[in-house]
Curated annotation (Swiss-Prot):
GO molecular function: 2-isopropylmalate synthase activity; acetyl-CoA C-acetyltransferase activity; manganese ion binding
Cofactor(s) the protein requires to work: Mn(2+)
Native source organism of the sequence: Bacillus cereus (strain 03BB102)
Record keywords: Amino-acid biosynthesis, Branched-chain amino acid biosynthesis, Cytoplasm, Leucine biosynthesis, Manganese, Metal-binding, Transferase
Protein known as: 2-isopropylmalate synthase
Pathway participation: Amino-acid biosynthesis; L-leucine biosynthesis; L-leucine from 3-methyl-2-oxobutanoate: step 1/4
One Pfam family from the record: LeuA_dimer
Biological role stated in the UniProt entry: Catalyzes the condensation of the acetyl group of acetyl-CoA with 3-methyl-2-oxobutanoate (2-ketoisovalerate) to form 3-carboxy-3-hydroxy-4-methylpentanoate (2-isopropylmalate).
Classification via NCBIfam families: leuA_bact, PRK00915.1-3, PRK00915.1-5
Protein localization: Cytoplasm
Annotated binding of Mn(2+), by residue: D13, H201, H203, N237
EC identifiers of the protein: 2.3.3.13
Catalysed reaction, written as an equation: 3-methyl-2-oxobutanoate + acetyl-CoA + H2O = (2S)-2-isopropylmalate + CoA + H(+)
GO CC, alphabetical: cytoplasm
Length: 506
């Protein structure tokens, strides 16, 4: 049975989702979780895009030990050399070079002839191969490319040294039958086909990204590309967790097994959702809140008698816990540390102490601490520790009618303390106005969302905000049992990012 490898592009293609803006620390958190998920290749970013992207890719490359780290590059020497500088420190570095091959792209975007495109492919892959042990070539807009020319371009790339050939459905145009036949066509028409691994990369514009990816596997693809939760530009990418579980459950049909640690799927999905602020729909396959819920009386009766009557996936397969009690206020530092290690977290003594302190505070107010609570605490404290500013004091007072007054005290990384107060028509508006006064911002609150992480009156709150000032838009999140504290943390998280961006462009 063939093993299907996964190339995750959450950190590059996924981050291109409108409204998503991850900082370096957040990208590193996701990269570490992708490593736990067993992802074979992670596309850490586009190193030549900006200095920030370069530094993020470089840090991930120097950190990850058990996965290939890849940078995207155009078919340009400067891009390729920049990608090399970013990932050369990786245990397993890879270059991902791309060039469009469809008539519409060659005519209107590239203004290049077919001969020019073939020459550029050969030169860029040859250069890449002189620097990297592994080179992946993508024929952008492959599914709208004339098949004979696509086969010619692929052959040129393989002869130049490409180890992996990606056939992307860049605009989500194809369907499963067409995509399957395209892979079969290339198998028959590319003389050097056996010298490379073929990969698929599907977008979801027509809602067929997962189905198309599975069809590609049937057609001979050995690598599937996509993102966690299917996030990405426009309608998004193929959701890797859906492809992986489909291959596992229907290995009898696909004759393939996913190379992924499936029990880490839920934790990965939750992390990506909270850091990006993109809420997972309740009815989403595999990771949605209702994925394993049954309301129909007939269904409930069947499941109680025999679970396989209406469930084809065991929740535990993807790491869906039953949210059972795991720790309490009497749990000590050692038990806490061991449980966090069991969940896959590694941290320094200082980081452990900060999260343990937050855990003890929560345990004093919450009778049962679940795995979801622990993950949320770890996420929240990691974000809090990485911020330019942290909240040291927060007070809200009723003034009159609906007017509230908030006093906020912030401390920066150098230990400087800032305090200010402001009013607003409600507690949250007052808090946000006070924070704006401290940071000297005049931004617009573009989005505010609150989620309960676990059930019950003592549940942790997760608040996501998006701030906009001029052309700059950033997101932030905060986790706390108190909604006002979570809201303040989220605003400080986002406002700190926004201030950094504004200072950078100045």
């Amino acid at each position: 049975m063939k093993q299907i490898l996964f190339m995750d592009t959450t950190l590059r293609d996924g981050e291109q989702s409108p409204g998503v803006n991850l900082n370096e620390q957040e990208k590193l958190q996701i990269a570490r979780q992708l490593e736990r998920l067993g992802i074979h290749v992670m596309e850490a970013g586009f190193a030549a895009a900006s200095e920030g992207d370069f530094q993020s890719v470089k840090r991930i490359a120097n950190t990850i030990q058990n996965a290939t780290v890849m940078s995207l590059a155009r078919a340009k020497e400067s891009d390729i050399r920049r990608a090399y500088e970013a990932v050369k420190g990786a245990v397993s570095p890879r270059l991902h070079v791309f060039l469009a091959t469809s008539d519409i792209h060659m005519k209107y975007k590239l203004c290049m002839s077919k001969e020019d495109v073939l020459d550029s492919i050969y030169r860029s892959v040859t250069l890449g191969k002189s620097l990297f042990p592994t080179v992946q070539f993508s024929a952008e807009d492959a599914t709208r490319t004339a098949r004979d020319f696509l086969a010619e371009a692929v052959e040129v790339a393989i002869r130049a040294g490409a180890n992996v050939i990606n056939i992307p459905d860049t605009v989500g145009y194809t369907n499963p039958e067409e995509y399957y036949s395209l892979f079969k066509y290339l198998q028959e028409s590319v003389p050097s086909y056996e010298k490379a691994i073929f990969s698929c990369h599907c977008h979801d514009d027509l809602g067929m990204a997962v189905a198309n990816s599975l069809a590609a596997v049937e057609g001979g693809a050995l690598q599937v590309e996509g993102t966690i939760n299917g996030i990405g530009e426009r309608a998004g990418n193929a959701a890797l967790e859906e492809v992986a579980v489909a291959l596992h459950i229907r290995k009898d049909f696909y004759k393939a097994e996913p190379s992924m640690t499936l029990k880490e799927i839920k934790a990965t999905s939750t992390l990506v959702s909270r850091l990006t602020g993109m809420v997972v729909p309740k009815n989403k396959a595999i990771v949605g809140a209702n994925a394993f819920a049954h309301e129909s009386g007939i269904h409930q009766d069947g499941v109680l008698k025999e679970v396989t009557t209406y469930e084809i996936i065991e929740p535990a397969l993807v790491g869906e816990s039953q949210n059972l009690f795991v720790l309490g206020k009497h749990s000590g530092r050692h038990a806490f540390t061991e449980k966090m290690k069991e969940l896959g977290y590694e941290f320094t003594n200082d980081e452990r102490d900060a999260v343990f302190e937050a855990f003890k505070k929560l345990a004093d107010r919450k009778k049962e601490i679940t795995e979801e609570d622990l993950r949320a605490l770890m996420l929240g404290e990691a974000a809090f520790a990485a911020q330019q500013y942290n909240i040291t004091q927060l007070q809200v007072h009723f003034v009159s009618n609906s007017t509230q007054c908030a006093t906020v005290v912030l401390k920066d990384e150098e230990g400087n303390v800032f305090e200010d107060a402001a009013t607003g028509s409600g507690s949250i508006e007052a808090i946000y106005n006070a924070i704006q006064r401290i940071l000297g911002l005049e931004c617009e609150l573009a989005d505010y969302r609150i989620q309960s992480i676990t059930q019950g009156q003592d549940a942790l709150a997760h608040v996501h905000v998006e701030l906009k000032e001029g052309a700059h838009q950033v997101s932030g999140f905060g986790v706390a049992q108190d909604v006002l504290e979570a809201s303040a943390r989220a605003y400080v998280h986002a406002a700190g990012k926004l201030k950094s961006f504004i200072q950078l462009v100045k």
